[in-house]
């Protein structure tokens, strides 16, 4: 796929804005497989429309040769008291998001925030509890 085709794929709907077309072209001239990241807070059950529009756009990026990562921010969900701040519920819904994105975007890298900190889960849990009771 040439650069023009890659750029057209990325710019097609539902994309509403690209910082600049020229920067995107230049990016592909200098890097044949740039990285893309999208982060999502687990604020409730995943809406099908959100999964489809986000997932299809991620797939456009992948087809254009972009390495995509979907970061599912389960710790942010806890910090922001979403899903009642119930870690068990957050974990279940996060797994649901993970499975859904793996199904729709099989070539994207799906990462849970808790996967990044699994060796220090107790530390992060205590830190989050502490910081939620402190203000500056």
Place the predicted regions along the sequence by residue.
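Glycine-rich loop at the start of a catalytic domain that most often binds anionic cofactors/ligands
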Residues: 52-55, 82-87
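Non-catalytic terminal extensions that flank enzyme cores
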Residues: 1-43
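Divalent-metal (Mg2+/Mn2+/Ca2+)-assisted nucleotide/phosphate chemistry catalytic cores
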Residues: 80, 87-136
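Histidine-anchored nucleotide/phosphate-binding helix
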Residues: 48-70
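Active-site-proximal loop/turn and secondary-structure-junction residues that shape catalytic pockets
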Residues: 42, 74-77, 116
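Structured alpha-helical segments in the cores of large, soluble enzyme domains
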Residues: 24, 58-66, 93-98
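Short connector loops at secondary-structure junctions
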Residues: 72-85
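Core alpha/beta catalytic barrel or barrel-like domain that forms the active/cofactor pocket
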Residues: 37, 69-75, 112-113
């Amino acid at each position: 796929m040439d650069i023009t085709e890659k750029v057209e794929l990325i710019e097609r709907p539902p994309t509403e804005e690209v910082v600049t077309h020229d920067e995107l072209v230049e990016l592909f001239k200098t890097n044949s497989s740039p990285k893309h990241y999208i982060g999502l807070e687990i604020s409730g059950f995943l809406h099908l429309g959100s999964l489809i529009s986000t997932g299809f756009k991620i797939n456009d990026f992948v087809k254009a040769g972009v390495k995509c990562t979907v970061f599912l921010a389960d710790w942010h969900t806890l910090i922001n008291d979403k899903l009642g701040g119930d870690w068990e519920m957050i974990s279940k819904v996060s797994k649901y998001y993970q499975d859904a994105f793996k199904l729709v975007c099989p070539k994207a890298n799906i990462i849970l925030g808790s996967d990044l900190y699994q060796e220090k889960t107790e530390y992060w849990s205590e830190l989050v509890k502490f910081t939620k009771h402190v203000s500056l």
